[in-house]
Amino acid sequence: MSSISLNVLDDSVLIKPISEEKQGGIVLPSSAEKKPTKGEVIAIGEGSRNSSGERVTLTVKAGDKVFYRQWAGTEIEHNDEKLIVMKESDILAVIK
């Protein structure tokens, strides 16, 4: 796991995308490559609040490998690493 020092808020999740290995040695321009939809959870927020004001904790945790929606979240760069901040609801599955 990466040593990234960002504090993620509410029901947001910080993801480090995992690129799939390329087969066959064909190099594609970055604009033609499919966006990754698999990543590692680096950090999570404290959770959202329900109508009573109580915290609803997130299901995922740091270190989980997940599949997420292709165009989910906002891409950021921190310490020369490309990361994505998204809502937990954009995560489709946890890889066991």
Swiss-Prot record:
Keywords: Chaperone, Cytoplasm. The keyword Cytoplasm applies. It is found in: Cytoplasm. Coiled coil: none annotated. GO terms for biological process: chaperone cofactor-dependent protein refolding. InterPro entries: Chaperonin_GroES, Chaperonin_GroES_sf, GroES-like_sf. The keyword Isomerase does not apply. GO terms for molecular function: ATP binding; metal ion binding; protein folding chaperone; protein-folding chaperone binding; unfolded protein binding. GO terms for cellular component: cytoplasm. It comes from the Bacteria. Pfam families: Cpn10. Heptamer of 7 subunits arranged in a ring. Interacts with the chaperonin GroEL. HAMAP family: CH10. Together with the chaperonin GroEL, plays an essential role in assisting protein folding. The GroEL-GroES system forms a nano-cage that allows encapsulation of the non-native substrate proteins and provides a physical environment optimized to promote and accelerate protein folding. GroES binds to the apical surface of the GroEL ring, thereby capping the opening of the GroEL channel. Belongs to the GroES chaperonin family. This is Co-chaperonin GroES. The gene is groES.
